[in-house]
């Protein structure tokens, strides 16, 4: 028989850096889950990734106070900022000059990495979604 699910917890945690401090500790503590066990398992699962890379995680809490979790690919903004070699997007999109640029080849590469977590039917659709995200961050999309 399947375990009874009591809730889902969605967090974004840096790869290999889960610890009991907020936001992880309070979120898991409210459901009565073992915080240290989660931190050890998450850090072990993400140790091969670039340290500090933000990893979205969905934790499923069960009635018997056990849990399971699924890691997803980092957010689009992380990849776009990395491709443009900048630290943050524009604060005034459309009013000031673009803060950087990304090529369509870079967008295609990001789309291939992110495709399984995106709500797109094909790679071209994913590229268009990423182009929209880039534009809203103040990045120019150039052919190449």
From Swiss-Prot:
SUPFAM superfamilies: Ribosomal L11/L12e N-terminal domain, Ribosomal protein L11, C-terminal domain. Belongs to the universal ribosomal protein uL11 family. GO terms for cellular component: cytosolic large ribosomal subunit. This is Large ribosomal subunit protein uL11. Part of the ribosomal stalk of the 50S ribosomal subunit. Interacts with L10 and the large rRNA to form the base of the stalk. L10 forms an elongated spine to which L12 dimers bind in a sequential fashion forming a multimeric L10(L12)X complex. The lineage of its organism: Bacteria, Pseudomonadati, Pseudomonadota, Alphaproteobacteria, Acetobacterales. GO terms for biological process: translation. Forms part of the ribosomal stalk which helps the ribosome interact with GTP-bound translation factors. The keyword Ribosomal protein applies. One or more lysine residues are methylated.
């Amino acid at each position: 028989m399947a375990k009874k699910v009591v809730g889902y917890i969605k967090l974004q945690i840096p790869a290999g850096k889960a610890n009991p401090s907020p936001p992880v500790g309070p979120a898991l503590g409210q459901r009565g889950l073992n915080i240290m066990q989660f931190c050890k398992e998450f850090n072990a699962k993400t140790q091969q990734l670039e340290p500090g890379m933000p990893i979205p995680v969905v934790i499923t809490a069960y009635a018997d106070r056990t849990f399971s979790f699924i890691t997803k690919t980092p957010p689009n903004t992380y990849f776009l900022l990395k491709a443009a070699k900048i630290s943050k997007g524009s604060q005034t999109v459309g009013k000031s000059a673009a803060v950087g640029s990304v090529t369509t080849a870079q967008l295609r590469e990001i789309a291939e990495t992110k495709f399984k977590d995106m709500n797109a039917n094909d790679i071209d659709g994913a590229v268009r979604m990423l182009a929209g995200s880039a534009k809203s961050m103040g990045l120019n999309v150039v052919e190449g």
